[in-house]
Every structure is written in structure tokens, then in C-alpha cells.
């Protein structure tokens, strides 16, 4: 199957720098910010954004992991809702939580993320940052911070590769 590279490592770096600036501008600085990366690649994108925010604003933003497996609507065996689906060493109540994901597609993962967060805490605000928005939403969800809008056919797939997981950083469509 043919693959077409959309973003190389330098383009991804520039895109994440822009997203970091947009988050800071939207939040009027890094105060009260929390980044939660959706497993798996969203975690590393959140860490990269955290690093960029620290370079820009001099503040280390708390960053954590969000695993929405138990909240997905396509899984029938549910785990107890007492199990917290995120790992972060800070209180997220009354903070601006930014969910970070690699590809926004149907919106179902984001819906599960919202459920996972709101079952346990009450943030002041929740925003969504995504590297790629490919369209084809099934739910009324949109990203606040978008790296690239890449309209796709339903038969196409967007693949995000990151050094931390794949030993290569790029985004391609196949």
C-alpha cells in the first residue's frame, strides 16, 4: 500500500511549538495548566508540548497519562469506575486540563477521555489538542488546538510515528 508522508520530524516539532504557543496564549500563561496525554502517542506528544511550554514560559506544567480503555463504548467488559483512568501527580480540580491526542477521528476516544476525567475531578476547563484532525466525526466534538487538518477518505488511515515508540518521527497517510 502506498504511503504519503504528511509531516516529517522537523514539521512535527514546529507544529508542536505552535500548539504550545496557542495553549499559552489561550490560557494567558502556564498557570493552572495540566496536560493529559491519551495512551499511547498522546502521552509523548503531551511531554513534548510540556517541554516547549517550559522553554517558552519557564514553568513546568504537570503532565500525566490518560488510559480510556475502560471508558470506551465499544468494549462490553467494564472495569469498576472506581479505577482512576489517569496518572498524574497533581490535583486537577479547578485547573485547565488539556487533553492531548495524536489523531482526532470519530470523537469517541475524546468522549471516553471526558468521562474518565469528569468521573473523578471537576476541572475549571477542559480543552483538546491534537496533532492531526482527519474529520469523519461521529460525535459533536472539536479540537481547540489543531496541528494539521488533513481531510481523509474513510478508506485511508493516518499513521503517527514517534521516536519514543516507533524509533522514527513522522506522520503519513496510507
Curated annotation (Swiss-Prot):
InterPro entries: PRibTrfase_dom, PRTase-like, PyrR, PyrR_bifunctional
Keyword Ligase: no
Catalytic activities: UMP + diphosphate = 5-phospho-alpha-D-ribose 1-diphosphate + uracil
Cited Gene3D superfamilies: 3.40.50.2020
Gene expressing this chain: pyrR
Extent of motif PRPP-binding: 97-109
Domain of life per record: Bacteria
GO molecular function, one term: RNA binding
Its job: Regulates transcriptional attenuation of the pyrimidine nucleotide (pyr) operon by binding in a uridine-dependent manner to specific sites on pyr mRNA. This disrupts an antiterminator hairpin in the RNA and favors formation of a downstream transcription terminator, leading to a reduced expression of downstream genes.
Family: Belongs to the purine/pyrimidine phosphoribosyltransferase family. PyrR subfamily.
CDD domains: PRTases_typeI
Annotated EC: 2.4.2.9
Keywords carried by this UniProt record: Glycosyltransferase, RNA-binding, Transcription, Transcription regulation, Transcription termination, Transferase
Keyword Hydrolase: no
GO biological process: DNA-templated transcription termination
Annotated source species: Macrococcus caseolyticus (strain JCSC5402)
Subunit structure and binding partners: Homodimer and homohexamer; in equilibrium.
The protein's name in its UniProt record: Bifunctional protein PyrR
